[in-house]
Amino acid sequence: MKDLLKFLKSQTKNEDFDAIKISLASPDMIRSWSFGEVKKPETINYRTFKPERDGLFCARIFGPVKDYECLCGKYKRLKHRGVICEKCGVEVTQSKVRRERMGHIELSSPTAHIWFLKSLPSRIGLLLDMPLRDIERVLYFESYVVIETGMTNLEKRQILTEEQYLDSLEEFGDEFHATMGAEAIQFLLKDINLVQECNVLRIELNETNSETKRKKLTKRIKLLESFIQSHNKPEWMILNVLPVLPPDLRPLVPLDGGRFATSDLNDLYRRVINRNNRLKRLLDLAAPDIIVRNEKRMLQEAVDALLDNGRRGRAITGSNKRPLKSLADMIKGKQGRFRQNLLGKRVDYSGRSVITVGPYLHLHQCGLPKKMALELFKPFIYGKLEVRGLATTIKAAKKMVEREEAIVWDILDEVIREHPVLLNRAPTLHRLGIQAFEPVLIEGKAIQLHPLVCAAYNADFDGDQMAVHVPLTLESQLEARALMMSTNNILSPANGEPIIVPSQDVVLGLYYMTREKINGKGEGMLLNGSNEAEKVYRLGIAELHSLVKVRIIEYKKNEDKSFTAIKKIIPTTIGRAILWMIIPKGLPFSIVNQTLGKKDISKMLNTCYRILGLKSTVFFADQIMYTGFAYAARSGASVGIDDMVIPEKKANIINEAEIEVAEIQEQFQSGLVTAGERYNKVIDIWAAANERVAKAMMQNLSTESVINKKGYKQKQISFNSIFMMADSGARGSAAQIRQLAGMRGLMAKPDGSIIETPITANFREGLNVLQYFISTHGARKGLADTALKTANSGYLTRRLVDVAQDLVVTQDDCRTHEGILMTPLIEGGDVKEPLRERVLGRVTAENIIIPNTKNILIKRNTLLNEKWCDLLEHNSIDNVKVRSVVNCDTDFGVCAYCYGRDLARGNLVNKGEAIGVIAAQSIGEPGTQLTMRTFHIGGAASRAAAESSIQVKNQGIINLNNAKFVINSAGKTVITSRNVELNIIDNFGRTKESYKVPYGAIMAKGDGEKVHSGETVAKWDPHTMPVITEVNGLVRFVDMIDGQSITRQADELTGLSSIVILDTAERMSSGKDLRPALKIIDCNGNDVLISGTDMPAQYFLPGKAIVQLDDGVQISSGDTLARVPQESGGTKDITGGLPRVADLFEARRPKELAILAEISGIISFGKETKGKRRLVITPVDGSDSYEEMIPKWRQLNVFEGERVDRGDVISDGPESPHDILRLRGVQAVTRYIVNEVQEVYRLQGVKINDKHIEVIIRQMLRKATVVKSRDSDFLEGEQVEFSHIKISNRMLDKKKKMPATFSRDLLGITKASLATESFISAASFQETTRVLTESAVAGKRDELRGLKENVIVGRLIPAGTGYAYHKERLNRRQKKHNNPTVSSSQISAEEASASLSELLNSALIEK
């Protein structure tokens, strides 16, 4: 057996495996792993320090302590390899076998495995169908359980207390059998006939109707089936044999001073062995039952503590009062095996140092200190020295390097040439946090970094440190050069815009260089080309900013990549002409003929990349940087105290504000305004004053008046240093300048409320003590916020990466016709994001037709690049259906067409690109820039809430979407449908503005009419909701009895009387069943029918409705019958920033969410209960109606008798994404989440491409619930991977069988990560114990599809360059399968993977 095992173990080393299976280990399997039984609790001998025989470190069981040397020293050296010493019984072999050889302990009494007992839901409990409490009482020897009933009235699995047991013994004698402890449970588990039980339960499931019972049965059936399929036996959840971890994985290390440091596991094992031996002795002595029982209970507790300390009862503590670390603690958590050693490892050949600026470097270079390079590249240097024959041995080479001989430096230069190194700055938030550079040797001890890559690293030079890594193999060097070189990462993968963008000094230099100055020296000169411009500037004949005319040559790039020269004479400035020298051929002069700010420079680089490609852009970026630095130095811009000019008007403005505040205070004291109003008004006054001061200050700073050539005064933009820095985008902002030279303004208290006394001083004047104290609040809160934000943002990124890590581009085209309809994002009168930006880089899902014709403009499956987008704009197309990851039909992964352009490269995405991780990084990386706070609505926000009209901004044509309306007696259009959209469309058919119009709004202009800008097109009363009639006739009151269902009120001011409907709660008992309504009848007293239906026009009135009509009056369609007052929903705080993004991705249901109509039909109300009313929707086609209970305090948007469509809003509130998915489908929920997430990022000015969010949504929609299983193998109500249902249904379709029906589920990212197919990935994310328990019972197989699983098992990931490797591997396996030539000495892959799964199963694979 031993030899066979050795053979097996040597095989698993090199055997290539495809999947990993985890299952329960049988006692025989545990014994087969073992090399001997551990019988004694001793570890090592205190005198000789040699392991004790049969102890926890026994050399005979686990192998020799020293390489090739037995314990007694009889056999030493390699020549005795494989000999077993007859004296000490130790095999002569390498000592590293002590890391892999296991032992075992034969338990004298079975013990339950705590994971299967206590990890909820308890597997043992579910199998036996007994409550966990009862099982625990049996296991810990408090009660008996009946095993054999015999001819008694006891039931099997019945729990008996000590008394009941003794009574039954007296009554029935030996007829029945009841015991306690793990033996009893083991017996019961053995007794289960899985298949038979399963069939019984299935029959029961079909017969029951109770929902809870069905759920419980389904759970049991699933568990039983998983046991049947995985060939696990239930009794294996009870241990008879305990495996012992190899000793080198729980080491005992001698410390100085004769003490030992030991792993906690040794203590835990010692307790188990001690108790086990004692129990053995007691059983041999046939000790009294009560003593044996106690000992068995203690053994059970010791085993529990070893497996998972602290899961049951108090954790066992060591000598220093801290809980001992059990086996379960070894693998879970941040310090556990998964996250500490398998997903992240320490790296050899690396160093770290402080970074400084390298302004003279090229973009692909970094400065590496000589000392560091020498250390990092040592092996290469040794090798070179030996090859050259300069050193005879490695030892000699080592000496030479240590002495730092001159020749060593020459060789270092050679070694380093074209050998890229990787630079990494922590935290690595996205893939640009590690880039490759070619090292340049420098003196000093700091790494030099190229300034343009700082943005990608988020680095600055205030003491940041960076790590250097050396790629050793040729392949890794190739990857570093081809994929990770900084010159290949010009565009950001998050939004496809350049990330190599100059900032700060460079921007200031270029801004200064391209500014104009009126009447500068040399104005009006005519110059021939840039060289002459530079000459006159250098000679001092002309100033940098003077306006001159220059003759330049522009080059236009043709289709065939050649250039056409165009000569022009252009009015410009000297500086711009000089800058033109570095602009690459193919860009127009207009690009520099403007004052360049940061945005313009970014645009310039982007244009360059799109027109001229990567190489030119890299060269251009370097030139921009050198020029910018040079001219920033020439500009001599600096910050002096006199640059901060305080406006003269400031004192007046503040005085006026103080007078206004005093007035309000008087009004408050005389009781004209409330405290709240006073506070709000005071804050508004100061906010306005602050704005005025800021405006005056900016006017002052930004312009200066100069004398022009003709001798007149003229205003020009100022050359004030502080203004230039802010205006160019180099540093600072108007808000900061305002605090320097204006006034600091209002400050907030720590709880977010605003302090009403503002700081009127600015930093130039200086703050007094009180003002300084007030401003410390904000500063401190900012620091605390930042710390919290970093942690939260990091956790969000981790969850996102985990949910999306296995999403890789796996095929070119999945051929789906599905897609998302993209429209420009319009809110109110503003286009927030034009269509062009939303579809750029996507693939069209269907042909795009030129409007009003049948001609195809763009074919299906075209990647929309900049040129196509220009075409779209030219033809004024305002909606495009594009392919999306959410609709992709690929089973595992996505296809390239559904993803579209790889944003970091600008072409169609390649196969093997890990788009999931890229998406997660793009969303998580800006997380630290988002705010943490929830916004409190006050001041401005509450005023905007009560909108009552729509005023358009652009002229155009009105277009009403899904609108129903009637014309009232005044000839105006009245809206009678919900969720109406009003769009303003320009002459080209493009939507310019979009508004929501409420029910009952009166339109000034109708559908299709022209409007001018500033015109008001719709009005409504924001405080009441009208009930509008759609027919003409006479009003008839129904059930409106004074004092019972209505009361009459007279208005004090007008004297008009009105009728108010009483709420049911306020009515007397006699009026409870009355249902007040207004009926419309014709002059003969017959009911008027609503047009197009056979329903009488009857309008039921809700409580609190106000009617201002009399019985029998004539009314016409569009008139208001009654008004229902709308309570203004009190101010709610909106969650913003990071928490909002987390809520959306976790798919949390909001509080007080909107109620949506589940089906289409007619609304009516059924019988009410105390706090709820019953809403009934009856479909028009006569199918089953739908009922829902709604709390009475909810405001409803619908009246009785109204028609709603599925998914319409019945009661307002934040919508739940789950409802949107269920009622409106995948498209709608995608649109909702994308827009909501983008809203948060847009507020912070962060650009993220929509497709990244869609990638995460695809992963959230991974699961589906089976509605009807039909001919498939699924259970009804079971949650299954969507891809499995798709594959299964395809198979059933082929066989002409009935496929399963299903509904898609939306899971939050945490849930989705834990519900993934791969148990390795789930276990390494969170809740390790639960995941492993579940997987072991079900005998799960991990196909190793994702990236994480492959990293953990130590393989290349199936993405990027590893994608090809895995493909090749699969092909090889296919070939092997097709023509198997297995010799008898080989073992099959199945056996090998089985033995591997056994190793893994006991959580023992260390590396």
UniProtKB/Swiss-Prot annotation:
It catalyses: RNA(n) + a ribonucleoside 5'-triphosphate = RNA(n+1) + diphosphate. GO terms for cellular component: DNA-directed RNA polymerase complex. Belongs to the RNA polymerase beta' chain family. Zn(2+) 1 binds at residues 70, 72, 85, 88. Mg(2+) binds at residues 460, 462, 464. It comes from Buchnera aphidicola subsp. Acyrthosiphon pisum (strain APS). It comes from the Bacteria. The RNAP catalytic core consists of 2 alpha, 1 beta, 1 beta' and 1 omega subunit. When a sigma factor is associated with the core the holoenzyme is formed, which can initiate transcription. SMART domains: RPOLA_N (SM00663). This is DNA-directed RNA polymerase subunit beta'. It is an enzyme of class 2 (transferase). Keywords: DNA-directed RNA polymerase, Magnesium, Metal-binding, Nucleotidyltransferase, Transcription, Transferase, Zinc. GO terms for biological process: DNA-templated transcription. Its cofactor is Mg(2+); Zn(2+). InterPro entries: DNA-dir_RpoC_beta_prime, DNA-dir_RpoC_beta_prime_bact, RNA_pol_asu, RNA_pol_N, RNA_pol_Rpb1_1, RNA_pol_Rpb1_3, RNA_pol_Rpb1_3_sf, RNA_pol_Rpb1_4. Binds 1 Mg(2+) ion per subunit. Binds 2 Zn(2+) ions per subunit. Pfam families: RNA_pol_Rpb1_1, RNA_pol_Rpb1_2, RNA_pol_Rpb1_3, RNA_pol_Rpb1_4, RNA_pol_Rpb1_5.
